[in-house]
Amino acid sequence: MEASMPKRKEPGKSLRIKVISMGNAEVGKSCIIKRYCEKRFVSKYLATIGIDYGVTKVQVRDREIKVNIFDMAGDPFFYEVRNEFYKDTQGVILVYDVGQKDSFDALDTWLAEMKQDLGPHGNMENIVFAVCANKIDCTKHRCVDESEGRLWAESKGFLYFETSAQTGEGINEMFQTFYLSIVDLCENGGKRPNTNSSASFTKEQADTIRRIRSSKDSWDMLGVKPGASRDEVNKAYRKLAVLLHPDKCVAPGSEDAFKAVVNARTALLKNIK
């Protein structure tokens, strides 16, 4: 009697997705896409005029994915062109240059632009965002460190990657994880899969770390008025210590923030009788 042959697993259905790139001009959006799709780096800067469009096919698990990529110009001049392309998007590559603080600070503005153009019925919770901290090869000029970028991304539930379009570092990992997350989204009824990144720390912890980073002096860091008493300083310190202690807080940058708070308390108490 012949042994029964094992059944061949049916390949998954093909999937078509739309991906857009967002970020200021000259942060490397086009170079990241070229590095992945064409395996090359273009050193000469050529500004994207309006929108560049490309199609690529990738294999994710057992599914063939046809990716429609819309590389959007970062110049404000092209806003009237960009605003037509935000709708029906499954994935966003959000890029900033680690050597340009203004490009990092502009990420919130880019999200606001997208939210506005999606309209009241648009839902950004059902889109996968991958944040690329690009040009990490330019270490001498870096002014946005990894913990600051990661904190911003993970506090919003976004994926975060350190990338270099020039060397290729982090590019393949980013796209593979990005596409996998989009497939999970599509298979999950259009709902963004839980990355567990935003659930690992609270908004209060993230906001406090940002505030400490930008504080102008030790008083400001502890959140007390100049001339505060020893008891007021200690009370403010204890509250921050409980919130940010590395044993209890896993938010990126929490350890440095905790050390800064300890140093601020020490400095203030030296001058308070």
Curated annotation (Swiss-Prot):
Transmembrane segments: none annotated. The keyword tRNA-binding does not apply. One of its GO terms (molecular function) is GTPase activity. GO terms for cellular component: nucleus. GTP binds at residues 23-30, 71-75, 134-137. Keywords: GTP-binding, Nucleotide-binding, Nucleus. One of its GO terms (biological process) is intracellular protein transport. Residues 217-273 form the J domain. The keyword GTP-binding applies. Coiled coil: none annotated. It comes from the Eukaryota. Pfam families: DnaJ, Ras. InterPro entries: DnaJ_domain, J_dom_sf, P-loop_NTPase, Rab, Small_GTP-bd, Small_GTPase. Residues 1-18 are annotated as: Required for interaction with MAPK1. It is found in: Nucleus. Interacts directly with MAPK1 (wild-type and kinase-deficient forms). Interacts directly (in GTP-bound form) with MAP2K1 (wild-type and kinase-deficient forms). Belongs to the small GTPase superfamily. Rab family. GTPase which can activate the MEK/ERK pathway and induce cell transformation when overexpressed. May act as a nuclear scaffold for MAPK1, probably by association with MAPK1 nuclear export signal leading to enhanced ERK1/ERK2 signaling. This is DnaJ homolog subfamily C member 27. It comes from Bos taurus. The lineage of its organism: Eukaryota, Metazoa, Chordata, Craniata, Vertebrata. The gene is DNAJC27.
